[in-house]
């Protein structure tokens, strides 16, 4: 991980010296376009950059709009509109190594990955920060809907963006703590309609560009992408209460906890949910809604954006994007991981997803949800 110099005298962005150099991550979307424009207007020396992820042997339509060659063309045109230099940076190898490979490996293990978290942690705020230092930049800026707060102690905190529908702090829990002072989020205090209005006022060509909805390297359904890269393996679907075989499947990688549609059971007059995936025995276990309720979780690969000793024992945790955080009690926390007890049982807490910690609007850190240990009927 990149080592950052100490910066006790770092001024908040609102008081930053004129002409500070900033590397602005551009995606060809409206958020990063406005980010570059606002920074330029605030007196920063802006360098626009887009990270190339798509390989040469892929069709241009195999990557979503935020990562495609067309997006690179639009990002370059916006940089010209704003009046800043633009670089297309080759990150194909790190992207395959850190993002696509682990994404498929997690599905093969019966887990549900979130590649956007890995991308921010291991590519954008690691590889891109290294490039920023090489270019003599003091800051990296992105179009994330996240608020940077410089507190009274001179420390930088990340808080939820002012637009609750667009808040993206969930994806940034893995940001190295020593990188926080060097990251700017110019649109974090804006709502999406305001961002589009700013883009329109400045004549930016991305002002009305539709938002990206998919995982950038998955052009369609995740199941289709997984099927293309992981071999099928026929196995049984079993009832968690009895061990009875109630159906067949073509691989545990095609299922996720809580799933109730597309199970293909032999016959069932009750709604069944996926409650456990066991790739070792190639078994998909199903049961009632209550079988998917969890009273707590354990997380690994933890990262904290404050001193561990300052982590409150009562906090909030968010276990998937676009769901409300829930109150939780910290049973244990160390540098490697943590264990939480929910105030109320939670449905389908999926291993591989992120457990993200908050105190009010402040992002405290997070970890990867660990596999659940549970007793299973003997296989016959």
From Swiss-Prot:
This protein's record includes keyword Transferase: yes
Main location as per UniProt: cytoplasm
Marked site: Interaction with tRNA: 144, 353
Localization of this protein: Cytoplasm
Residues annotated as catalytic: 119 (nucleophile), 216 (cysteine persulfide intermediate)
Enzyme Commission code: 2.8.1.13
Any single Gene Ontology cellular-component annotation: cytoplasm
A Gene Ontology molecular function term of the record: tRNA-uridine 2-sulfurtransferase activity
UniProt keyword Nucleotide-binding, yes or no: yes
The protein's name in its UniProt record: tRNA-specific 2-thiouridylase MnmA
Biological source species: Deinococcus radiodurans (strain ATCC 13939 / DSM 20539 / JCM 16871 / CCUG 27074 / LMG 4051 / NBRC 15346 / NCIMB 9279 / VKM B-1422 / R1)
Upper classification of the organism: Bacteria, Thermotogati, Deinococcota, Deinococci, Deinococcales
Gene: mnmA
């Amino acid at each position: 991980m990149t080592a950052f110099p100490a910066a006790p005298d770092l001024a908040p962005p609102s008081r930053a010296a004129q002409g500070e150099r900033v590397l602005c991550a551009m995606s060809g979307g409206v958020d990063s376009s406005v980010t570059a424009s606002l920074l330029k207007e605030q007196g920063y020396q802006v360098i626009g950059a887009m990270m190339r992820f798509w390989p040469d042997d892929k069709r241009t339509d195999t990557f979503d709009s935020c990562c495609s060659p067309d997006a690179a063309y639009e990002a370059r045109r916006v940089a010209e509109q704003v009046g800043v230099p633009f670089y297309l940076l080759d990150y194909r190898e790190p992207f395959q190594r850190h993002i696509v490979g682990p994404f498929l490996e997690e599905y093969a293990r019966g887990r549900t990955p979130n590649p956007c978290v890995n991308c921010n942690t291991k590519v954008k705020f690691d590889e891109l920060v290294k490039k920023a230092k090489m270019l003599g930049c003091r800051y990296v800026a992105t179009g994330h809907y996240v608020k940077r707060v410089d507190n009274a102690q001179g420390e930088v905190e990340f808080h939820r963006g002012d637009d609750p529908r667009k808040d993206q702090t969930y994806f940034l829990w893995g940001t190295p703590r020593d990188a926080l002072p060097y990251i700017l989020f110019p649109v974090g205090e804006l709502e999406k309609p305001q961002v589009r209005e700013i883009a329109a006022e400045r004549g930016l060509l991305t002002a009305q560009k539709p938002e990206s909805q998919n995982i950038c390297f998955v052009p369609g359904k995740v199941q289709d992408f997984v099927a293309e890269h992981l071999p099928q393996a026929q196995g049984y679907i079993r009832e968690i209460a009895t061990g009875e075989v109630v159906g067949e499947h073509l691989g545990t990688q095609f299922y996720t906890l809580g799933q109730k549609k597309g199970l293909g059971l032999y016959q069932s007059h009750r709604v069944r949910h996926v409650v456990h995936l066991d790739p070792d025995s190639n078994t998909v276990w199903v049961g009632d809604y209550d079988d998917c309720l969890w009273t707590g979780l354990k997380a690994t690969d933890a990262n904290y954006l404050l001193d561990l000793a300052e982590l409150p024992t009562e906090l909030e945790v968010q276990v998937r994007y676009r769901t409300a955080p829930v109150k939780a009690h910290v049973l244990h926390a160390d540098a490697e991981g943590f264990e939480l007890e929910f105030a109320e049982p939670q449905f389908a807490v999926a291993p591989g997803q992120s457990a993200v910690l908050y105190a009010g609007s402040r992002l405290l850190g997070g970890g990867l949800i660990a596999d659940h240990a549970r007793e299973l009927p003997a296989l016959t």
